[in-house]
Amino acid sequence: MIEINNKIDYIFYTNNTPNTYKIQLILLELQKEYGITFESRFINVFKKENYSDDYIKINPNKKVPAIVDQTGEKPFIVFESVSILIYLAQKFNTFLPDFKTNPLENSEVITWTVWQAANLGPAFGQYFHFSFFSPTVQEYSLHRFNNEAQRILRLLDDRLSSTYIGGNEFSIADIASAGWLLYLNSAPLYNATKERFPNIFKWLDLINQRESIKQVNQSISDGFKNFNPSLLRALFTNDPELINAKAPIGIENVILKYD
């Protein structure tokens, strides 16, 4: 049963993946600046806890992240990572310019926040899946999503000729992309991409100084050490040969195939 804790401002449903890291980041930022309290509740998708009747009441889409805002007269649920980012940014009037006073800046930040969810996240998710988690080599999929990942990184590197993704200030546009791009801090991906995308790594060096980013970087590092691809495959197939197969590329070679 999903229990409500009225002593906590926000309940945060997570499973330590890129989209949930976005929400961890903004909650940590709000905790530092405004003293909010939040409680993280891990949803084990490998045990299909996201399909439980209790969790479906939180998120009928059966995915993470989700939050329950307990600061009002009654608990209010928000799911989908970008929706949560916009909700919290608007509520605290931070990391997102106010539309009434700065409509153009507001639109620019929202545009790049939504861009992440529509482009960066899906492309990187598919590329990592077929290169690291897929039990068989699928050259077409690898080629397609490798090319798309390159296109997105080139676009973002051009964009980051400015200081931050959404403009001149740190915003939810940076938080949204950080959930995925902080993985580039890991040694194999760092070595493969740093020289090719200097502005992205200049941006990473800048945001890596934030305490919230440092905490999420540690979570990502721990995840690399502990994750077993077979657990993910078991969500999609019952074939033991596919579940236990060796990854076709492996994390050490991800994003190395440049045309």
UniProtKB/Swiss-Prot annotation:
InterPro entries: Glutathione-S-Trfase_C-like (IPR010987), Glutathione-S-Trfase_C_sf (IPR036282), Glutathione_S-Trfase (IPR040079), Glutathione_S-Trfase_N (IPR004045), GST_C (IPR004046), Thioredoxin-like_sf (IPR036249). GO terms for molecular function: glutathione transferase activity. CDD domains: GST_C_Ure2p_like. It comes from the Eukaryota. Pfam families: GST_C, GST_N. Residues 7-96 form the GST N-terminal domain. Residues 102-232 form the GST C-terminal domain. GO terms for cellular component: cytoplasm. Belongs to the GST superfamily. PANTHER family: GLUTATHIONE S-TRANSFERASE-RELATED. This is Glutathione S-transferase domain-containing protein DDB_G0274705. The lineage of its organism: Eukaryota, Amoebozoa, Evosea, Eumycetozoa, Dictyostelia.
